[in-house]
Curated annotation (Swiss-Prot):
Belongs to the class-I aminoacyl-tRNA synthetase family. ValS type 1 subfamily. Pfam families: Anticodon_1 (PF08264), tRNA-synt_1 (PF00133), Val_tRNA-synt_C (PF10458). GO terms for molecular function: aminoacyl-tRNA deacylase activity; ATP binding; valine-tRNA ligase activity. GO terms for biological process: valyl-tRNA aminoacylation. A motif ('KMSKS' region) lies at residues 529-533. PROSITE patterns: AA_TRNA_LIGASE_I. ValRS has two distinct active sites: one for aminoacylation and one for editing. The misactivated threonine is translocated from the active site to the editing site. One of its GO terms (cellular component) is cytosol. Transmembrane segments: none annotated. A motif ('HIGH' region) lies at residues 51-61. The keyword Nucleotide-binding applies. Residues 815-854 form a coiled coil. This is Valine--tRNA ligase.
Length: 880
C-alpha cells in the first residue's frame, strides 16, 4: 500500500468496484479480521449463522452479514479482540434434492449409483458452492476470520456430533421409538417442521355417522380426511359439550372395518368445529397422536411410506390415498352413514423441497427427549443470562420451551451426519464415538451402520462450540466461548436458536451467547414478501455491481429495528447510492481545500459555526454510540445520515466555503478535518470501503495518533460533553431556520435562480449575533439586501408582503422582490376563474341524486374532499 502522501489526486466520482477489491485484499493481508492476540480486553464474538450450501446468497443473507459486520467493525474499532467465525451448512435434504435433480436429468438415481458414489457426487457439487458463498460474503465486505471457516461436515463438527449423540444416548435422552413425524413421500424421508410449508387449500368436511354399539343411535363425526378412517381408534368429544352428555364410555362400531372403538372425552376437541365430535386417528395426525398417548389408544398405521394403503386399511389395501377416499365416501353413502359434505378451506402441509403433500405418520425414528434438556435452556433466558432482542420474543421462546415435544432427529437421507449406531447380526446395537470393528457381545465383525442421517439442525445446534473445537478443550474454546451475540432471523428462533441454547447448556454447562438479536424479513417496496414467482426478488450481487457494496449495506440496514420487517426497492437503493456520492463529493471538497499535508490546529477562539458543528458532532457521537449499544442500528444510521447530509454538508461546508474565500477570516480547515475524521469513523461500520478510501486521503492532515492507522482499526469516536454548546446550537438553529424558510419561499413562488429577494429579519435579542452572519444568509438564501433588525414584527402577510413567523424571529419579504405584482394579479385572477368553474361542476355533480345513488361511497367522498379543497383555495387566493 502506497504511503498516504504518495496517493494520487482524488477521482471526481467514486469508483466502487475498484476501491472494494483493493481494500478487502489489503485488510486480509494485514490480518485485520483476526482477533488481536495481544489485547487484554474481553473478546467480542459472533459465530455466523451458516448459510445453506445450496445456492447463492439472497437479501436475507446480505442483511445478516451486514448487521453482523456492523457489530464486528464497531467493536474492533473500540480495541476489542473481535472474532467473527464464518461457516457453511451442509443443508441436508435441501442439498441432496438439488443433486438428485441433476442426476435425474441424466436419467440416473442415487439408488443406481449407490451410497458411496452418490456421496462423491455430493462433494463434487458442494465444494465449488462453498467457495462461491465465501466469495459472495467477501464482496459484502464481511470481515470474518476466514482461516477459521467451518463446514458442518468438517472433521471437527463430525467429532462433536458423535460426542453429543453418544452422551445423550448414554443418559437415556436419545432413543429409538415410534412417534408421529412429518413424512415426505417424494423425498422419502422424515422432515422437520421448518421444512413444511402450509398452504390453504379448498377441500371438504365430511359428516359421517358412526353407529353406537348398543344400537341406541349414532355419533356424527366431522372430518377432512375420510381416507384415514380405517385407522380410527376412538371418537372424541369435549367433556363440557352437553350435546353428548352420557356418551363418554360407550362404544361405536367403525363402519367398513366393523371394529369397536370407544367414545372418549378430551379438552383438545374444538366444540365449534363441525359436529363437535371428531374421529381419532393417532397414527396419522399429530394432535390425535398426543390424544392417543393421553388415553392409551392403539396406533394403527394404514399407509405405506409411498402413501398407498397397507393391509390395515382392509378392503382399501393397495389403493392410493385418493382412491381410498373415494371408496370410503361411496361406501358410507351406500350404508346411509354419509350425512352431508361441506366446502371447507384448510391448511395442508407441503414439503418445502419438492412440494409434495406431507403425510403425518407414526414411524420408527430416532428421537431426543427434550423436556429435561429444555429446563436449563428456559432458565437461562428467564434469569436474564441470555437477552433476546426484541423482548417480545421472550414469550415466544418461553411458550415453545414449556410445550416442547420430543425431537425427531433421524432422516432417511444419505447426505449428512450418519447416525453413529451399528447393528450386529446377533442383535446387539452399538452406539459409539468412533467406528467399531468388533461386536462387544459376540465378537462378530459384520457390523452394519444405521442407514439414516441426522437432522441438519442437530449439528447446527452445536455450532457455537463445535466451531471452536469442542469436544476438545482448545484455546479457542476457552477464550471465545460463550459468544457475545447471536444474530439471526426471527423465523428460526425455535428451530435453531432454542436448540443452540439447549446444546450449549448440555455440553458446556454455559449459555452459548449472551444476546440474541433477531432481525426481520426484507420485503419489497410494497411490503410484499419477495419470491421468484412474484418476480420481485432483488439479487444482492447485481445491486453491488450497479450501486456498490456500501450502497447495498446502507440500504438493507436503513430503517431496520430488531424483529421488525423492512422494505427495500430501487428508491432506497438509489438513495443509498446518492448518499455515498454526497459523502464522496463533500469529502473531496474538504480534502482538496486543505493545502499542504500537515496537522491542522484550530484557533483558540472559534467562530459560531465551528462551535456549532463541533457541538453537534459530539451530540451525534453520543446518540449513535448509545443506539449502537442498544442494537438500534437502523436508528443510529438515520441519526448519522441526517447529521452528515443535513448539517455537515448542507450547512457547515456551505458556511466554510465563504470563509475559505476570505483569507482574513479564521480558517475552517482544522474543524473540517476534525469533523470529517469523526464522520468517517462513525460511518465505517456501515460503509467500510468508501470510508477507508476517503480516510487514506485524509490521513496526512490527521493528528499523529491517527495518521498511521487504517480506519478499520482506528479508535471509534468518543463523545466529549465539554464540547456541547447550547448557545451555538440555538443561534445556528435560528440561522438555519431563516435560510431554510427563505429557500422554501423562493420555491413556493418559483423565483428564478438569478433573482435576489429582499428580507427584513426581526430577531429580537439575537439580532446582534445573527448580524455577524449577514453575508452567509445572503449567500445561502440568495437574498440581498437582508436587514437584521432588533425587536419583533407584529404584522401579518398581505398582498404586498409575506411574513414568516419562525422560532422567536419574524422574516418579512416584499412580494415585489419575488414576483411582478401585475403579472401575479392576472395569474391569480385566472386561477380563481378556473377553480370556480371546477367548483360549479363538482357542486352540480354532488347534487345529482342518480350519481349519489350509483357511485361507490369512496368516489363520492373523494369528490367532496376535492370540492372542499377548491373552495378553501379560492378563499385563500381572494384574501391574499
Amino acid at each position: 500500500m502506497a504511503q498516504c502522501s504518495d496517493l494520487p489526486e482524488m477521482a471526481k466520482a467514486y469508483e466502487a468496484a475498484e476501491v472494494e477489491k483493493k481494500w478487502y485484499q489489503y485488510w486480509m493481508e494485514k490480518s485485520y479480521f483476526k482477533p488481536n492476540p495481544n489485547s487484554d480486553k474481553k473478546p467480542f464474538v459472533i459465530i455466523m449463522p451458516p448459510p445453506n450450501v445450496t445456492g447463492e446468497l439472497h437479501l436475507g443473507h446480505a442483511l445478516t452479514a451486514t448487521l453482523e459486520d456492523i457489530m464486528i467493525r464497531w467493536h474492533r474499532m473500540q480495541g476489542e479482540p473481535t472474532l467473527w467465525l464464518p461457516g457453511v451448512d451442509h443443508a441436508g435434504i435441501a442439498a441432496q434434492v438439488v443433486v438428485e435433480r441433476e442426476l435425474a436429468k441424466q436419467g440416473k438415481t442415487r439408488q443406481q449409483l449407490g451410497r458411496e458414489l452418490f456421496l462423491e457426487k455430493m462433494w463434487e457439487w458442494v465444494n465449488p458452492c462453498r467457495e462461491k458463498i465465501r466469495h459472495q460474503h467477501m464482496r459484502l465486505g464481511a470481515s470474518c476470520d476466514w482461516d477459521r471457516e467451518t463446514f458442518t461436515l468438517d472433521a471437527g463438527p463430525v467429532k462433536a456430533v458423535r460426542e453429543i449423540f453418544t452422551n445423550l444416548y448414554e443418559k437415556g435422552l436419545i432413543y429409538k421409538g415410534e412417534r408421529i413425524i412429518n413424512w415426505c413421500p417424494r423425498c422419502g424421508t422424515a422432515v422437520s417442521d421448518l421444512e413444511v410449508d402450509h398452504k390453504d387449500l379448498a377441500g371438504h368436511i365430511w359428516h359421517l355417522r358412526y353407529p353406537l354399539e348398543d344400537g341406541s343411535g349414532f355419533v356424527t363425526v366431522a372430518t377432512t380426511r375420510p381416507e384415514t378412517m380405517q385407522g380410527d381408534t376412538a371418537v372424541a368429544i369435549h367433556p363440557d359439550d352437553t350435546r353428548y352428555a352420557g356418551m363418554v364410555g360407550k362404544n361405536v362400531v367403525l363402519p367398513i372395518m366393523n371394529r369397536r372403538i370407544p367414545v372418549i372425552a378430551d379438552e383438545a376437541v374444538d366444540m365449534a368445529f363441525g359436529t363437535g365430535a371428531v374421529k381419532v386417528t393417532p397414527a396419522h395426525d399429530p394432535n390425535d397422536f398426543e390424544m392417543g398417548l393421553r388415553h392409551n389408544l392403539p396406533m394403527i398405521t394404514i399407509q405405506n411410506r409411498d402413501t398407498t394403503m397397507n393391509e390395515n386399511a382392509g378392503p382399501c389395501s393397495g389403493m392410493t390415498a385418493k382412491a381410498c377416499r373415494e371408496y370410503v365416501v361411496s361406501e358410507m353413502k351406500s350404508l346411509g352413514l354419509l350425512l352431508r359434505i361441506e366446502d371447507y378451506i384448510h391448511s395442508v402441509g407441503h414439503c418445502q423441497r419438492c412440494s409434495a403433500v406431507i403425510e403425518p405418520m407414526v414411524s420408527k425414528q430416532w428421537f431426543v427427549k427434550m423436556e429435561p434438556l429444555a429446563k436449563p435452556a428456559l432458565e437461562a433466558v428467564n434469569s436474564g443470562r441470555i437477552q433476546i432482542l426484541p423482548e417480545r420474543f421472550n414469550k415466544v421462546y418461553q411458550n415453545w420451551m414449556e410445550n416442547i415435544r420430543d425431537w425427531c432427529i433421524s432422516r432417511q437421507l444419505w447426505w449428512g451426519h450418519r447416525i453413529p449406531v451399528w447393528y450386529c447380526p446377533c442383535g446387539e446395537m452399538i452406539v459409539a464415538k468412533v467406528d467399531p470393528t468388533v461386536c462387544p457381545k459376540c465378537g462378530g465383525t459384520e457390523l452394519e451402520q444405521d442407514p439414516d442421517v441426522l437432522d441438519t439442525w442437530f449439528s447446527s445446534g452445536l455450532w457455537p462450540h463445535s466451531t471452536l473445537g469442542w469436544p476438545d478443550q482448545t484455546e479457542d474454546l476457552k477464550r471465545f466461548y460463550p459468544g457475545t451475540v447471536m444474530e439471526t432471523a426471527y423465523d428460526i428462533i425455535f428451530f435453531w436458536v432454542a436448540r443452540m441454547i439447549v446444546m450449549g447448556m448440555e455440553d458446556m454447562n454455559e449459555v452459548p451467547f449472551r444476546t440474541v438479536y433477531l432481525h426481520g424479513l426484507i420485503r419489497d417496496d410494497k411490503g410484499e414478501k419477495m419470491s421468484k414467482t412474484k418476480g420481485n426478488v432483488i439479487d444482492p450481487l447485481k445491486v453491488i455491481d450497479q450501486y456498490g457494496t456500501d450502497a447495498l449495506r446502507f440500504a438493507v440496514t436503513f430503517g431496520t429495528s430488531p424483529g421488525n420487517d423492512s422494505k427495500l426497492g430501487q428508491t432506497k437503493l438509489e438513495a443509498a447510492r446518492n448518499f455515498a456520492n454526497k459523502l464522496w463529493n463533500a469529502s473531496r471538497f474538504v480534502i482538496m481545500n486543505l493545502g499542504e499535508a500537515k496537522e491542522l490546529t484550530p484557533e483558540a477562539e472559534l467562530p459560531l459555526e465551528d462551535r456549532w458543528i463541533i457541538s453537534r458532532m459530539n451530540r451525534v457521537t453520543a446518540d449513535v454510540t448509545r443506539l449502537m449499544e442498544e442494537f438500534q442500528f437502523g436508528e443510529a444510521q438515520r441519526v448519522l445520515q441526517d447529521f452528515i447530509w443535513g448539517e455537515f454538508c448542507d450547512w457547515y461546508i456551505e458556511l466554510a466555503k465563504v470563509r475559505l474565500r476570505d483569507e482574513a477570516s479564521v480558517s475552517p480547515r482544522p474543524v473540517l478535518v476534525r469533523v470529517l475524521s469523526s464522520i468517517l469513523r462513525l460511518l465505517h461500520p456501515y460503509m467500510p470501503f468508501i470510508t477507508e478510501e476517503l480516510w487514506s486521503y485524509l490521513r496526512p492532515y490527521l493528528p499523529e495518533s491517527l495518521r498511521e492507522t487504517d480506519i478499520i482499526v482506528a479508535p471509534y469516536p468518543a463523545a466529549d460533553k465539554t464540547c456541547f454548546d447550547e448557545q451555538a446550537e440555538s443561534v445556528m438553529g435560528s440561522l438555519v431556520e431563516i435560510v431554510r424558510s427563505l429557500r422554501n419561499l423562493r420555491a413556493e413562488h418559483n423565483v428564478e435562480i438569478s433573482r435576489y429577494i429582499q428580507a427584513n429579519i426581526y430577531a429580537g435579542d439575537m439580532a446582534s449575533v445573527l448580524g455577524n452572519y449577514l453575508g452567509a444568509v445572503e449567500t445561502l438564501s440568495r437574498a440581498r439586501p437582508v436587514n437584521i433588525l432588533p425587536g419583533h414584527y407584529s404584522g401579518a402577510s398581505t398582498a404586498t408582503e409575506v411574513v414568516l413567523v419562525l422560532t422567536g424571529i419574524e422574516v418579512v419579504v416584499p412580494m415585489s422582490t419575488m414576483v411582478d405584482l401585475e403579472v401575479e394579479a392576472k395569474r391569480v385572477k385566472a386561477e380563481i376563474s378556473e377553480l370556480e368553474i371546477q367548483i360549479e361542476r363538482l357542486s352540480t355533480r354532488l347534487s345529482d341524486e342518480q350519481f349519489l345513488a350509483k357511485a361507490p361511497q369512496a368516489v363520492v367522498d373523494k369528490e367532496r374532499i376535492k370540492l372542499e379543497g377548491y373552495i378553501e383555495k379560492v378563499s385563500r387566493l381572494k384574501s391574499a
